[in-house]
Every structure is written in structure tokens, then in C-alpha cells.
């Protein structure tokens, strides 16, 4: 595509990694996903994690009830894996389309992961079942150990956990979520696209770790996996700018109340739903790779999940768009990524 492109029409995207939370927060943030995306993979790490079919059905119903009339989308539910997860429960949930995937959180790796897995060998029967039925395993890929530097956790996870897992279960479909490093890019590209792919967030494409400390600590840029060196950011940008089918859109939009982002133990997570798609467009434009925008946003994900590609389209135009400054949640607020900033692209209907 020409660098002078003023309008882009693509198949309506899906977001393959979304945190909607619950209750008041759910009610206030949900429309921002529905505005831009046709489907969304919903993360299960609520305060009471989604560990069963019944919990998933109930949570999906709450999501549907909260959905904005003008911004509807299809929530794709996931199961939070614990040491108590039953292979039969997973198989039933997957066969009935209650779950589209299961999520592996290493214990203590991020928000509400205290009941996550300490040793992946503890869930071998679950993984055997998932490989057999073709159920994708979604992974937060960080090795959690106080002796491992936080900036090295992702690379260590590949070495210590992911590579042995791939060798033991070569036909297990795996998504390494929100990758942040050159090592992850190289590892993913060297594996079969049918069995290993990765999502990439807009903030890891736009920022490096210096940004988190520019002018003082920036709590709203604190996320997990943490922002990395610029060489890693550039590796991510290069990965998406050549049309590689291994990589697809997963925003990891993660809302937290303002008071919980700025306190003594601030929460990790960036709420980017109001700007995520437009941020991806910005990055692809900067990389002169707009011709690959549709495959990353709208095609690679459904192909990996063996789902139909959407028929609906969305038109993005070269028109300034100011990102909402804050979202009120009762007496609290949520501050989104790029709060109050202006992006050069808008949805045509805006």
C-alpha cells in the first residue's frame, strides 16, 4: 500500500486476548471491545477464576447482559487451569463450545494468578487430553522465580518450560500470548504455524522500557510481561511487518481502577481497548506494512483457531481521533492507554 493511503477497508478484526473483569468494570469497558472487534477471547482470571463449565456459562451470560446495543461482539470463553482441572470437564466444555481454549497461568505471574500452575508436569493428563481433542493452550510465558531477572523471564520460560512442553506434546496447539522479546519471535517462527503461534499487544509494539520511567515512574505503563529493551520492540515490529502467519492480534487490554494502579503495590495491566486497533494501524503505517494489516488483525487468528473468517468489514480513515481521557466507574475512574492523545486514524462511522 502507498504511504499516502487515506482509507483502509479490512475484514472486521477479532481480539484474541481480552480482560473484561466483572460487575461495574465489565459494564463500563465492554463497549470499547465491541466497537472495534467481532469476536474476543475472554481471559478467565477473575477474582474467582473461571475454572468450570458452569462458571463460564454464568460469566458469559453476564457479559452478554452488559453488552452495549450498538457494539455487540461474540465472547469466546476460556478455562483457567489449576491442579484440580478435570480433563473430562475440559473435553465436555470444548465439545459443547463452552470453552474455545484453556489458559495456563504460572503461579504468581500476573493478576489473580495465585491459583495458577506451579509445575506444568502437574497437569500432564490435562495436556494429553487437550492435544488429543485439538483444544488450544493459551500461555502467559514467564518463568516465575525470584532468582530470575524480571526482564529475562520470557526467554527463560521458552528454555525451561515451553521447549520441553513442545517436545512432549508436539501436536498440542499453543498460543504464546503477549510476546515481548526477540527470543520469542525467533522461537515462534521456527515452529509449525498450525501448532504454535503468538499474540502481540499494541503497547509492546509502541513502547520500550525507557518509556515506563520517562520523567518519573509511569504506573500506567506497568504491565506483565513488562516492557523490554528497544531491540525487542523492533523484533516484534519486524515480525508483524512481513505477513508472517504465526502472529496475530491480541491486545491484552486489562482495566484496573485508578486507585489500584497508583497505590503502593500497583496492579499490572494496560487498558487499551479504546485505542488498540487504531494503535495497530499506526504501527503498520510506520513500518510501511499496511498491506499486512488485515492478515494480522483479521485472518491469522481465526485460521489458528479453526474458525471462520468474519464476513463483516470495517473502514479506517485518515482522520484524527482523540482517545477518551477517562472512564467513570461509580466513584472511581479507569485511565486508558494514550489517554487524551490524538491518533491519526479513525473508524469511518465516528
From Swiss-Prot:
Cofactor(s), names only, from the UniProt record: Zn(2+)
PTM-bearing positions, type N6-carboxylysine: 103
Assembly behavior: Homodimer.
Binding site for substrate: 19-21, 45, 140, 224, 256, 268
UniProt similarity note: Belongs to the metallo-dependent hydrolases superfamily. DHOase family. Class II DHOase subfamily.
InterPro entries named among the record's database cross-references: Amidohydro-rel, DHOdimr, Dihydroorotase_CS, Metal_Hydrolase
EC code(s) of this entry: 3.5.2.3
Superkingdom: Bacteria
Signal peptide positions on this chain: none
Record carries keyword Hydrolase: yes
Any Pfam family: Amidohydro_1
Enzyme class: hydrolase
CDD domains: DHOase
Biological pathway: Pyrimidine metabolism; UMP biosynthesis via de novo pathway; (S)-dihydroorotate from bicarbonate: step 3/3
Protein's recorded name: Dihydroorotase
Active site annotation, chain numbering: 252
Provenance organism: Buchnera aphidicola subsp. Acyrthosiphon pisum (strain APS) (Acyrthosiphon pisum symbiotic bacterium)
Described purpose of this protein according to its UniProt entry: Catalyzes the reversible cyclization of carbamoyl aspartate to dihydroorotate.
GO biological process: 'de novo' pyrimidine nucleobase biosynthetic process; 'de novo' UMP biosynthetic process
Amino acid at each position: 500500500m502507498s504511504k499516502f493511503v487515506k482509507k483502509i477497508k479490512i475484514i472486521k478484526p477479532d481480539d484474541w486476548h481480552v480482560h473484561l473483569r466483572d460487575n461495574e468494570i465489565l459494564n463500563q469497558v465492554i463497549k470499547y471491545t465491541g466497537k472495534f472487534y467481532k469476536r474476543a477471547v475472554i481471559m478467565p482470571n477473575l477474582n474467582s477464576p473461571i475454572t468450570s463449565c458452569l462458571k463460564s456459562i454464568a460469566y458469559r451470560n453476564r457479559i452478554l447482559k452488559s453488552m452495549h446495543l450498538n457494539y455487540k461482539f461474540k465472547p469466546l470463553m476460556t478455562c483457567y487451569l489449576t491442579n484440580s482441572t478435570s480433563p473430562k470437564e475440559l473435553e465436555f466444555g470444548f465439545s459443547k463450545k463452552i470453552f474455545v481454549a484453556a489458559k495456563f497461568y504460572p503461579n504468581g505471574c500476573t493478576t489473580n494468578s495465585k491459583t495458577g500452575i506451579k509445575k506444568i508436569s502437574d497437569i500432564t493428563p490435562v495436556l494429553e487430553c487437550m492435544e488429543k481433542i485439538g483444544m488450544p493452550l493459551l500461555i502467559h510465558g514467564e518463568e516465575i522465580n525470584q532468582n530470575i531477572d524480571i526482564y529475562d523471564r520470557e526467554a527463560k520460560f521458552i528454555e525451561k518450560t515451553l521447549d520441553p512442553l513442545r517436545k512432549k506434546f508436539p501436536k498440542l496447539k499453543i498460543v504464546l500470548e503477549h510476546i515481548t522479546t526477540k527470543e520469542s519471535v525467533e522461537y515462534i517462527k521456527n515452529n509449525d504455524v498450525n501448532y504454535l503461534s503468538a499474540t502481540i499487544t499494541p503497547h509492546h509494539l509502541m513502547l520500550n522500557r525507557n518509556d515506563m520511567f520517562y520523567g518519573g515512574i509511569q504506573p500506567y505503563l506497568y504491565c506483565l510481561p513488562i516492557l523490554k529493551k528497544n531491540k525487542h520492540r523492533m523484533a516484534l515490529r519486524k515480525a508483524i511487518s512481513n505477513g508472517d502467519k504465526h502472529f496475530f492480534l491480541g491486545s491484552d487490554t486489562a482495566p484496573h481502577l485508578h486507585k489500584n494502579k497508583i497505590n503502593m503495590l500497583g496492579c499490572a495491566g494496560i487498558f487499551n481497548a479504546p485505542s488498540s486497533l487504531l494503535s495497530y494501524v499506526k504501527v503498520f503505517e510506520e513500518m510501511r506494512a499496511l498491506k499486512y494489516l488485515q492478515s494480522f488483525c483479521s485472518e491469522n487468528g481465526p485460521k489458528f483457531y479453526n474458525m471462520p473468517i468474519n464476513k463483516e468489514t470495517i473502514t479506517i480513515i485518515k482522520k484524527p481521533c482523540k482517545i477518551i481521557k477517562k472512564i467513570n466507574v461509580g466513584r472511581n475512574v479507569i485511565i486508558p492507554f494514550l489517554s487524551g492523545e490524538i491518533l491519526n486514524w479513525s473508524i469511518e462511522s465516528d
